[in-house]
């Protein structure tokens, strides 16, 4: 709800601006939030390592921007952005930077990172228990950062009726107080990712561990992502996402998420082994 609703609320705050900036390869709801608010949705190119390229943002787009979305670890590529650079970019231009950090607990290359490590002025960090604690059904999350912006969002959002029921709040608070289950889940995702890398490599598909997230971002043989999607479904019973779901820049790639149970993954591994024997 926050991702798709934020542009509308920000436009009420700054009616002279009409643009939402977001990574060119990203969760589709960033773009949809702009569309629902009647804003311009402007994708920001990524570099060769799938990190947002701030230098590619045009001055005229920055001057009209309501916000810049960043996502670390990124979905679908799992790359880690320079959040300090993103915060500095926004402050220099008066553009709020909203950092989607829902996968932060699943950072594999170095320690977890947050935009709040670079100060709170002009930034928001957005978190979700859907990923951290597997509590997607509760629709519980939180944002923190710039005091003025956080206060504004609280005061406007409460009139929309988007209030989390008390039992869901209590469950979310209990989950946030406990880190052990998060560590267990992170270790589980890491094992699953390693197993999926081995499965894909055994099929002749190049794959490697991401910097973060619980998904692999792989090149489709001959650049045909739909052929790979169909092959993995037919041969292994694995459902994947073609890269173009996340934007045109995803052409020729496939996202493979490590979200099946360990028992199901064992079946996939056996099927792959049988094919190679």
Where are these regions (language model features)?
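Conserved glycine-rich beta-strand-loop-beta hairpin in the small C-terminal domain of fold type I
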Residues: 169, 173, 189-197, 207-219, ...
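Active-site phosphate-binding strand-loop segment of PLP-dependent enzymes
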Residues: 48-109
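Helix C-cap/helix->beta junction micro-motif
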Residues: 37, 92-93, 203, 236
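Phosphate-binding glycine-rich loop
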Residues: 1-19
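Short hydrophobic alpha-helical segments of the AMP-binding
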Residues: 10, 30-34
């Amino acid at each position: 709800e926050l991702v798709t609703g934020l542009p509308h609320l920000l436009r009420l705050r700054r009616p002279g601006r009409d643009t939402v900036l977001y990574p060119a390869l990203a969760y589709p709801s960033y773009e949809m939030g702009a569309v629902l608010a009647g804003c311009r949705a402007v994708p920001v190119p990524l570099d060769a390592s799938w990190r947002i390229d701030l230098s590619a943002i045009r001055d005229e787009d920055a001057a009209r921007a309501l916000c810049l979305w960043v996502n670390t670890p990124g979905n679908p590529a799992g790359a880690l952005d320079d959040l300090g650079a993103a915060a500095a970019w926004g402050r220099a231009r008066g553009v709020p930077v909203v950092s989607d950090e829902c996968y932060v607990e699943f950072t594999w290359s170095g320690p977890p990172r947050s935009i709040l490590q670079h100060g709170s002025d002009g930034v928001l960090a957005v978190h979700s228990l859907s990923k951290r604690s597997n509590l997607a059904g509760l629709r519980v999350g939180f944002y923190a950062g710039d005091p003025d912006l956080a206060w504004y969002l609280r005061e406007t959002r409460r009139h929309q009726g988007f209030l989390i029921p008390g039992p869901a709040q209590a469950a979310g608070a209990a989950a946030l107080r406990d880190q052990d289950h998060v560590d267990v889940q992170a270790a589980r995702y890491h094992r699953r990712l390693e197993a999926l890398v081995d499965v894909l490599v055994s099929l002749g598909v190049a794959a490697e561990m991401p910097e973060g997230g619980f998904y692999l971002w792989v090149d489709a043989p001959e650049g045909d992502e739909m052929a790979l999607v169909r092959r993995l479904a037919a041969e292994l019973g694995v459902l994947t996402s073609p890269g173009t779901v996340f934007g045109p820049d995803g052409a020729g790639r496939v996202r493979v998420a490590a979200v099946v149970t360990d028992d199901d993954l064992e079946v996939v591994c056996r099927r792959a082994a049988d094919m190679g024997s």
